Amino acid sequence: MAFFRRLILMIQFLTRIPIKYESDITTEDFGKALALVPIVGLIIGGIMGVTYMLLVKVFFYKISAVLVLIEYIFLTGGIHLDGLGDTFDGVFSNRPKERILEIMRDSRVGTNAVLAVISVIILNYVILTEIDPAYMVKVIILFPVAGRLGSIVSASLSTYARRGEGMGKSFIDYCTLKELAIGIILYAVIFLSVGLSRGYIIMIFPILTAVILIKYFTRKIGGATGDILGAVCELNQTFYLMTVYAVLYFRG
């Protein structure tokens, strides 16, 4: 079935989880499959949540938090962090659009990339350690779900910025508002099923932040790329943690 073929495609492409499965894949499958990435986020988050529960039996919760974040990088291969770095190198170079796109494709790592990646990782760690441990497992499970929603929003609300082909083109060209609707439904079902306190409020903000982020990036370069989809994913996760902290803090 197309559903399982596309889900496996996303697991293979976006994670290091070893799944040996081969089938005929089209460029359209990549864009259509993007609707299913909240499920991929749930798989990643589920692994992280179980790992955290085991780690806190041995280590202090702050050590457990940093180890879980390292596990996240390992599970994803840093693919979205790479996109974050490339995006910041290009967008904040203060160059014309075409030069920005060239910088984003350059394999060399610039100062903006290093600062962006380090800042996001530190922010994620600091916020996690400030969250009430009673909520930690649920917060961790939903962390990659909120992030991957950002990729769907970004792809469905933008056009491809480069001339010619690129990996991001398949996602952006074929991820339509239909995929966005499916993705948001899956995202909402997962969010509410996990049962995080005030989850119905918290789940709205990653949608809004993703829209704001993609509008900003597309205004800078006239569209989006695969790197930008990854950048929005990572930034969305950090803004999600900020939202969780704020909502739980003011809840008292």
Swiss-Prot record:
<comment type="similarity">
    <text>Belongs to the CobS family.</text>
</comment>
<feature type="transmembrane region" description="Helical">
    <location>
        <begin position="109"/>
        <end position="129"/>
    </location>
</feature>
<feature type="transmembrane region" description="Helical">
    <location>
        <begin position="228"/>
        <end position="248"/>
    </location>
</feature>
<feature type="transmembrane region" description="Helical">
    <location>
        <begin position="199"/>
        <end position="218"/>
    </location>
</feature>
<dbReference type="Pfam" id="PF02654">
    <property type="entry name" value="CobS"/>
</dbReference>
<protein>
    <recommendedName>
        <fullName>Adenosylcobinamide-GDP ribazoletransferase</fullName>
        <ecNumber>2.7.8.26</ecNumber>
    </recommendedName>
</protein>
<dbReference type="GO" id="GO:0009236">
    <property type="term" value="P:cobalamin biosynthetic process"/>
</dbReference>
<keyword id="KW-0812">Transmembrane</keyword>
<dbReference type="GO" id="GO:0008818">
    <property type="term" value="F:cobalamin 5'-phosphate synthase activity"/>
</dbReference>
<keyword id="KW-0472">Membrane</keyword>
<feature type="transmembrane region" description="Helical">
    <location>
        <begin position="36"/>
        <end position="56"/>
    </location>
</feature>
<keyword id="KW-0169">Cobalamin biosynthesis</keyword>
<keyword id="KW-1133">Transmembrane helix</keyword>
<feature type="transmembrane region" description="Helical">
    <location>
        <begin position="133"/>
        <end position="153"/>
    </location>
</feature>
<keyword id="KW-1003">Cell membrane</keyword>
<dbReference type="GO" id="GO:0005886">
    <property type="term" value="C:plasma membrane"/>
</dbReference>
<dbReference type="GO" id="GO:0051073">
    <property type="term" value="F:adenosylcobinamide-GDP ribazoletransferase activity"/>
</dbReference>
<feature type="transmembrane region" description="Helical">
    <location>
        <begin position="59"/>
        <end position="79"/>
    </location>
</feature>
<keyword id="KW-0460">Magnesium</keyword>
<keyword id="KW-0808">Transferase</keyword>
<dbReference type="InterPro" id="IPR003805">
    <property type="entry name" value="CobS"/>
</dbReference>
<comment type="function">
    <text>Joins adenosylcobinamide-GDP and alpha-ribazole to generate adenosylcobalamin (Ado-cobalamin). Also synthesizes adenosylcobalamin 5'-phosphate from adenosylcobinamide-GDP and alpha-ribazole 5'-phosphate.</text>
</comment>
<comment type="pathway">
    <text>Cofactor biosynthesis; adenosylcobalamin biosynthesis; adenosylcobalamin from cob(II)yrinate a,c-diamide: step 7/7.</text>
</comment>
<feature type="transmembrane region" description="Helical">
    <location>
        <begin position="170"/>
        <end position="192"/>
    </location>
</feature>
